[in-house]
Amino acid sequence: MVAGLEEVRRRSLLYTDIDDDELVRQHSPLMSPLVWDLAHVGNFEDLWLVRALGAQDATRSGLDDIYDAFRHGRASRAALALLGPAGARAYLREVRGRALDLLDRFGPLPDDPAHSLTIPHALPVGIGIATEPGAAPPVPAGTSPTGTGTPSGAAARATEGSPLDADADAHDRLLTRGFVYGMVIQHEHQHAETMLATHQLRAGPPLLDVGATPAPGRVVPRREVLVPAGPFTLGTSHDPWAYDNERPAHRVELPAFWIDTLPVSNRAQMAFIDAGGYDDPRLWSPAGWEWRQQEGAHAPAFWWRDGGIWLRRRFGRIEPVPPDEPVQHVCWYEAEAHARWAGRRLPTEAEWEKAATHDPVTRRSRRYPWGDTAPTPDHANLGNRTSGPAPLGAYPTGASPCGAEHMIGDVWEWTASGFTPYPGFRSHPYREYSEVFFPKSGETSAFRVLRGGSWATGVPAIRATFRNWDYPIRRQIFAGFRLARDAE
């Protein structure tokens, strides 16, 4: 646990090791000033590891309101009385010191469950919702990489004390299998990805070093695979670090469908552009066409054409667009229009998860496409090792049982599904992570689900059941898509 906390803190400090002026500036109304994110992860850690577990007073009073994502939207946070860069770093050190002192009280705790957990995700035919005795309760955590969820909503605490004051059993549930530490670790990884999105949006020369060269791709023609009809297990009831919206595991019957083995490439998006896809209203939904006209979009965000060459801006550097990488920085409406142009559609999130996890031989769902072991650099492109997507075909050992590749890492993948609760959903430990984003009865979801994580996602903060969500207009996120179709 200590190693996990230290690893993600290194990421946070690395992405904020820049001039103070850059830290306090609001680079886009879509994002917070980086100094807000920095102090916010400390406030979240203070809330859960110091106050909730240790029943201690707040490390510093007067900060909960300022760093409450529900009370203050991103566009307004620069006007708050934020801690300055030096103050934010000092606050993080103070909180971490107290959290580690308290950790010693609770004895040995498990490491990231991805390294040791065997997850029995098989559901015998005839079983509906899985509610195994002794399963760890749901674990919501921090702000989603896309910026929709929040880890510290106002309703999570009425004062600057513990959010668990009224629940005598909640303390023990937080410690079960160490999941409160997993919650904090994942939350900070999610904010690290948010910080990278802010860096991508800022203007000016580069501030971040370029990551390692990604694994080489291989020539893989566009191919689709048939996923047979039948039941599979959607979600999880066993994973101790899973958020509440991933729970509970339940049996889902799906008809057969085809899905591409690879995400859509930059080359394919260029073909869509050259075919007039951005200018043909027949390819767009009414809401999508309205967005396209208002935005004036003619290509993915950060792209432009110079003569016959497509260029992009990546963290302040100008470079040609690599044709064989997965396309990223496209919104859901762009993905939907491309799919319609290609005579295809986006997969539902249930289809995506079945293609990613279901093993027809064992009739169980895996934690990752390749199995239950934690991702390595041979499996997937994660953790900002490369500063961007890897070429398609770079990770054959990360393929799922059906042969789909790049299902984890590289780009978040838009799905056709709105963000709704699973049958038997129970919010825990508070409503503001997921429940408040679900549609009210009789309404449709304003959000679309994304799956799989990106090259910027921390390893502890992704698994095949992970559900991200955002508005269909979002482009600053590291998102792409893959195509599917009904089986004839």
Model-assigned labels for residue ranges:
Residues 1-32, 36-43, 47-61, 65-98, ...:
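Disulfide-stabilized, aromatic/cysteine-rich ligand-recognition loop
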Residues 104-113, 236-237, 358:
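Short regulatory "switch" loops immediately downstream of catalytic or recognition motifs
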Residues 174-175:
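A conserved hydrophobic secondary-structure block that centers on an alpha-helix together
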Residues 269-272, 355:
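A structural signal for short hydrophobic/aromatic patches embedded in well-ordered alpha helices
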Residues 110-171:
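Intrinsically disordered, low-complexity terminal tails and inter-domain linkers enriched
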Residues 57, 131, 152, 279-280, ...:
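Residue-level detector of short coil/turn "hinge" positions at structural boundaries
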Residues 180, 184, 189-190, 194, ...:
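Functional-site microenvironments in short loops/helix caps that host divalent-cation chemistry
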